[in-house]
Every structure is written in structure tokens, then in C-alpha cells.
Amino acid sequence: MPLLEGSVGVEDLVLLEPLVEESLLKNLQLRYENKEIYTYIGNVVISVNPYQQLPIYGPEFIAKYQDYTFYELKPHIYALANVAYQSLRDRDRDQCILITGESGSGKTEASKLVMSYVAAVCGKGEQVNSVKEQLLQSNPVLEAFGNAKTIRNNNSSRFGKYMDIEFDFKGSPLGGVITNYLLEKSRLVKQLKGERNFHIFYQLLAGADEQLLKALKLERDTTGYAYLNHEVSRVDGMDDASSFRAVQSAMAVIGFSEEEIRQVLEVTSMVLKLGNVLVADEFQASGIPASGIRDGRGVREIGEMVGLNSEEVERALCSRTMETAKEKVVTALNVMQAQYARDALAKNIYSRLFDWIVNRINESIKVGIGEKKKVMGVLDIYGFEILEDNSFEQFVINYCNEKLQQVFIEMTLKEEQEEYKREGIPWTKVDYFDNGIICKLIEHNQRGILAMLDEECLRPGVVSDSTFLAKLNQLFSKHGHYESKVTQNAQRQYDHTMGLSCFRICHYAGKVTYNVTSFIDKNNDLLFRDLLQAMWKAQHPLLRSLFPEGNPKQASLKRPPTAGAQFKSSVAILMKNLYSKSPNYIRCIKPNEHQQRGQFSSDLVATQARYLGLLENVRVRRAGYAHRQGYGPFLERYRLLSRSTWPHWNGGDREGVEKVLGELSMSSGELAFGKTKIFIRSPKTLFYLEEQRRLRLQQLATLIQKIYRGWRCRTHYQLMRKSQILISSWFRGNMQKKCYGKIKASVLLIQAFVRGWKARKNYRKYFRSEAALTLADFIYKSMVQKFLLGLKNNLPSTNVLDKTWPAAPYKCLSTANQELQQLFYQWKCKRFRDQLSPKQVEILREKLCASELFKGKKASYPQSVPIPFCGDYIGLQGNPKLQKLKGGEEGPVLMAEAVKKVNRGNGKTSSRILLLTKGHVILTDTKKSQAKIVIGLDNVAGVSVTSLKDGLFSLHLSEMSSVGSKGDFLLVSEHVIELLTKMYRAVLDATQRQLTVTVTEKFSVRFKENSVAVKVVQGPAGGDNSKLRYKKKGSHCLEVTVQ
């Protein structure tokens, strides 16, 4: 094993030589200076706080420690977490991880590393990942509301936390339960120099946006709040703004709704604003001192935020109601009493809010009832504290640490040595300090310090901190671990550091002097009933739920338990919980008092090493056995290593264990057989057993696979053989059936042929020679008849647009079917034409002619299709003057409309009336009633028109005519399609020739002797024929723009 390869110093202190305090300290210092902060004592991890981030964490290291046993890699918290998790998962043993040490030694970070490792290595899946994320995200929420900067630690836990993480049989997390112990709520109203209040206040003021601050009626400046230490508002290495956003995100992940988060922040801001409520003296006629609120603004803002009348708040803060069974008396409070009531209310609100947050987290991460689970507990509790001024909080904190030290002693030092004695294992006793006498001094039910404090709080008459101290001096004057000024004077000892109001306890970690001032008040932890009832009357749902005892209907005159009694009871439950689990220890050490990286104070570390009992722990580990287990469980786990015990063993458990270890040829010095357990001295031997078991499991897995594969192949072969026989039988039967069918069909065919031949032979004289033709003709006619009758019943509609036709049922009738389809269509067309009047026929012929001339050629043609040709667009029939224009021309006027004539010289237009008759085209001025120009249709040579939507066209005349000698005409008509169609038909009727209609954008027009090129272009407006712009370009070119 590579435990000693490439190591700095000794990685496991069990191997340290010589085993003295000096060499132990030098080894820790050498490793610390080389950034090796973890060291083993057997399976105990010693962690020295580096005060910096080291590159020894993350997924890469988690994967590495997951694949190796405890001693195969460098010492690490991950290794201990892996051992605990595997013992829980594989050996079905509940585990607990105890993290102890002074304040600032790195306990909180160690607990985070344990939780992150367990979360990384346990199961996967959407639900499992959700549970893991909720467990991990509980840390930033609890740290924000329960941690603060102290003189010794920038992120000191000011409460105790024990988390039970619950797993299923596969080792996947199901949820958890968090238990909190004694929040240091006195910090809320007063902090020592260089310390801060709880983190959440600074995070809220730094990280909340302006809208949230306005809603909470807060200002960002921390100097505006009496409860915040103005000297230290920022901490190096902490970003309060980003931490606040992280807390909000973590609360959402855990399951807090947006409304719950808002209510928590409102109660938090209310506590902060309570500190700014100033109390002043008020005059009463009776002369009794009274008090009142100096500035009502703060009280009004609090009332508006939580839905409470400001007068109700002021009355509750400045007066007190004394109630007995018969009467109720209201007394005014003086300024000191009102300030005490204000601070007591703030502390109670915050403490109850913290408890509510813990319970709310537990609701989200709790496991369903009835589920079988395994448990891993992680204890992160405040460290041992020795301050300049130690009060009630330090007393109960150090009492808790005494109990944890007692757990370590009894489960590691005392229990281990007593177990050797019970099991009959030879053992040399190792002396150690048993702190049970100190625990008894504090917690004894009748004569302990806590019992005396409760008795003094409940005693009638004048009670004070000094009477409590006098009682302690009387009871413990001869106790070896108790000192005070009175006991020192009695022994004629003089200590100027001991005050008159102080007592001293010699703890396992050193002597601590406690100032009894406020011990009685802090232990009573009383809140006046007026304040309870006022908070219950609030309309704020969360605040109201924090004070259920404020409900007058549930009012009780019973005195609530004291803070000391509650804490003692909680510690007792915690100890019972820890004793029920297999312990794993992380002993945290603080290398210096200044939280500086790289500094190692030998005196400070030596003090911690002594009271943690590291040397005694090493001696016990060196003299003892690394692993012990009952014969039954040991045999159950390792019996597969022996052919004698595997797969069945009918003898006793101890004999079976001896058989297993005997076949493995284990050294007798490595083993000891107790009365009920087997003891293994070194971890190396245990690892060897585990390795042999792993190899054997692989062999058994291979054997199982081999047997399973053989069984599967045999089963598959038998199934295939059975299937083959079945298929063969069915195939042979089917082949015989087919063969029989063919033979039968052949026989029937031969029989039919023979019978036919015999019949034809016998009846040939009765047959006519043309019978076959007659039958064929009959069959063909039947087919034709059937086809024609079917066609008759399925004829398409008589609509000329319907061209559907049934298909021929026989190929021989396809030609006839096509002829019938053509005849039917022609008949439908004739029938349609016969129904038309002559006028309708003429209209359709004109439309047909227009289609042949302009369809697909002229852009304006589609618009003219649905519009009937009118012919008369100037009201010719109703105007006798206009009728005279046709002169002596006989017959009707085919077209009459107003057109525009383009001037040959300048390109300007002038209005004209155009009449089209069967023989002439007549142009006249609109102001005159006589024809100006008469053009015979035989003189019209052709017409040119553009493909655009304009109405421009050129009327080309024969040069030989008298009218044509002056040149062609360039005209513009709004009905150019109709005009040219009628002109085309009139020319055809008059001259028996087709009029040439040219569609083009470029054409030549003859003006007298000159030829002018006309070019028509599309303008940007896009083809509206109502506007044409003419522009002459030289004497032989005219450009027309269609706008």
C-alpha cells in the first residue's frame, strides 16, 4: 500500500516515533507547511485549518477516493466520508460524523466537504438529484441566518446543527432531518468590538434591489441601524450582495415559495427596525417612572409592514399586564424595562424565525413515513470558546463541547479498553483524562450548575445573579474543577483576573471564567404576555404563526421551561442519537489566532492537542486492534473465502471463523479471538480480507455467469429443437398436402378431358360447324350490351365544363369508348349552343376573338374578361347630334367612345370621339358635330399595342390612301381590348382579310414623311393606364412612360 510513498512526515500518527508531544507537533507543523492539512490517527482525521483554498477538492479527487480504500491514498476528509458511506451502504450500519474543535478551526467547511462528497458518490436520477440539491442548498440558508463574524472566525456558526441524512437500501438519499441547538440570539442586540451581527442583515442591505428595499422600508446604509456594529460592516473575502442572491436561489431550490421568501425578509427587516425604536421618559401624575416612544415613525412603519396598529405596538413595549386568577393590573415600564422588552421581542422574533426556517427546510427534505432507511448523521456545532467576557451563551456552548468530548472518550478510549476486558483480550491499560466529573458538575439533576440556575429562577422572593453565584460558591466550594473569588479567598489564593461576579470551570480544553451577569435573565428568556398577544394580533401570516401562545383562548399561566433546561434536554437527545450510531471523527485544529495562512503556533496547537487527547488516542490505537466484529456477521461476510464454509456451514460461528482464517494462513499476531468477537490488529489485514473477498466475488460472479449462460444455452437449444421438430412436421405435412392437391387436380383434369373427349365423340353428329362463331358473336354482343347499358346508367353531367368519362371495362372496347366520349362532348357543346340567343352568340364570339388576340400577351386582358363589351360609351343612342357623325353610313355603330389622340409634333394629347362602323373608323372633335377624319377599313394596314396595362395603340394606315398620306394615328383608349377586337372582326367582315395586331413595347409610327420610333416603358408606379407621360427624344423618337 502506498501510505508512506512520497509522503511528508508521517501520515498516520500511529506510526509516529518517538510517541511524544514534541514529535507530534513537529509532524503536524511539517505537514501543514507543505499544505498537507490532513493526518490520520487510525480512522480519525485531524484537520488543520489552512485559511486558504487548496487544490485538493472537486470531482477529480472525489472520483479518486471513491475507488480506493482508506489507507491507499493521502489522508483526506473524502476518505473518511467514503468509509462512512460504504459502511452504511454495504454493512447496513447507521453512521455519524462528529466534527469537533475550537471556533475558527474549520468545522463548518469540513461538514460541507462531507456532504458534498456523499452527494457526489450516491445514486443518480432526477428525484435523487433533487433531494441532493435540497440537502446541499440548506447550508447557505442556515449560514446566512445562523452564522456571524466573530473575533476568531469570519463565518462562525452561532448555533448547533445536527443533520441526519437518510438513505434507501441502495445508498441513494431520500431526504433528511435538521436539528438546531441554541441560537446565540443575544448577538442580535449587542456584538463585541470587531464582530458582526448575523450575516443575513448585511446581505439583505447589500444585495436587495431598490424596489425590495423600498417595500421593506429599509435603507442600504448599515450605519442607520442600531443593531448592526458600525465598525465592521464588511468582511474580507465575503461578497454580501452575491451571497444574498445565493440565499434567495437556495430557498427557491429547497421549496420556499416566493410569498414565503417575501414574508421571511419582512420579518427580518422588522427585527432590524425594532432596534431603531427609541424609548424616552414620560411624566405621570403619580410620579411613577414611565416610558414612551420618542419617534413614532419607526413603529408606524413596523405596523404597516406586519398589519399591526402602531398604538398597539407602543402599548405592548411600554407597559406590562400582570394577570392573576381574579384580577388584571397594567403597570407602566420605565425606560430600562421598555428597552429590555424591545430587545427581548427582537431576540424572540429572530429566534422563532430561525426555528421556523429549519422546520420549513425539514418539511421539504423529510422522508415519507414507512420507508425503510439508513441514516448518516453530520454534527456541526459551535466550537469551544474562551473569550474575554464569557456569558451564559459560552457556558452552554462549552457544556455541549464537554459532552461531545465525553462521547469521544467513552466511544473511543474508554469503550475500546472496556471491550478488550469484556472479551478477554490481553491489554495494557492506557491512562486518559475522563471529563465525566465536569459534565456531572454542570448537568447533575439535583446539584448541577444548570439545576441550581433553574432553581434560582423559580425561587420566590428577590432573585439576582449574585444570589445564584452565592449558591454555587456554597455547593461547589470544594469541587476540584470549580473556582470563584470566594473559594480562592478561602484557600488563600489570590487571582486578580477573577472578578467578584465570576466563577471559573476547569474544562477539558482549559480554564474558562464566566461572568454571571444576565445569567438569570438569559436562562428565564421571558417575553411579556402583552408582546406575545400583540404579535399574535398581527395580520402578517408568518409573524402571527411564530407566536401561537399569544392567542388569548390558548393562554396558559404555566411557566415555560428555561433556556438551560431546554438545551440540556436537547443535548441529552443528541447524545442518545450519537451513541446509537457508528462514530467517525474529524478533529479540527486552529493553527493560529489571527486567521492567517501559513502561520503555525506550536503553543496554541499543543493546547488543542492536549485537550483533544490526541496522544492518548494514538496510544490506544497502537496498543489495540483496528477492527472488531461479531463472529456471526464476520462469518456471513467472509465465509465465501473457505470451501469448508461455502456455500453452507452447519457448525458454530466461531468455528466457522477459525476455518476461514485458518485456510487463509493469517498470522496469529494479527488476530485475537474474543468471547463474542474477532479482533484484527492492522488495517492492512482487513484490507487483505476485503481484497480476497472482492476476488472471490468476481470468481463467484464468473461461476454464476457460466452456469447461467449454460442454462440459457441449453434452454435455448431445447426450445430450438422443439421448434425445429414442430416446423419439420408442419412442413412435411404441408408438402404432402400440396402434392396430394396437385395429383388430385391432375386426375380431375384428365377425367374432365376424357369425359369431354367422349362427349364430343358421341355427340359430334349433332353439332353444327358454325356453332363456335355463333357463341363467340353472342358473347361479344353481350359484352357490348353490358358496356352500353352501364354507360347509359353512369353518364356524366351535361355541363360543358365537365370532361369526366367512365373507363372502358374491356380493353377491346377502349377505341369505341373514346369515340363515344368525343361524340358525347360534341353533343353537349351543340346542346349548349342551341340554348344561346343570337346576341349571346355574338358576345361569346367577340370574347373568343379577344382571347385569341390578347390572352397571355396583354397585361390588361384578364381584367376585361368578366366585363361585357358595351360598344357605346358616350351615349350615342340618346344623342341625335352624335348620331349625325356617322353620316350616310348604313348599319349600326360597332364602337363609340372618347379617346385621346397623341399630337404628331409635340407629343401632347387631345380628346377625340371615335366611331367604328362596319366600313369606317371615324374621328371627330368633341366640340364639333361633324366628322373630322374618316378612315375606310380597307385602308387600315395594322395595329400596334403594348403588353402593359396601358390603353395606347397605333393605327397604321396604308400609304396609298389619301388619309394615310398624312401618317399613322397614335391613340389612347380606356377600352383598348374591346375596340381592337371589334375592329379586327369588322376588318375581317369588310375586306375578308385578318387585321395585323402587333403586341410590342417598341414600334414605328409614320408621321407624314418621317418615321418615329415609339418606346413604351413601365414607370415606378406600376402600370396604371390612366396616366401616360410622353417625352420626345430627338425628332425621330418618342418615349412613353406608363405611370
From Swiss-Prot:
Alphabetized, the UniProt keywords read: Actin-binding, ATP-binding, Calmodulin-binding, Motor protein, Myosin, Nucleotide-binding, Phosphoprotein, Repeat
For this entry, list what GO says about its biological process.
actin filament organization; actin filament-based movement; endocytosis; microvillus assembly; sensory perception of sound; vesicle localization
Chain segments carrying region Actin-binding: 571-593
Q: Which residues hold ATP? A: 101-108
Q: Does the keyword Zinc-finger apply?
A: no
Q: Which InterPro entries match?
A: IQ_motif_EF-hand-BS (IPR000048), Kinesin_motor_dom_sf (IPR036961), Myosin_head_motor_dom-like (IPR001609), Myosin_TH1 (IPR010926), MYSc_Myo1 (IPR036072), P-loop_NTPase (IPR027417)
Q: What is this protein called?
A: Unconventional myosin-Ia
Origin organism of this chain? Answer: Homo sapiens (Human)
Q: What is the lineage of its organism?
A: Eukaryota, Metazoa, Chordata, Craniata, Vertebrata
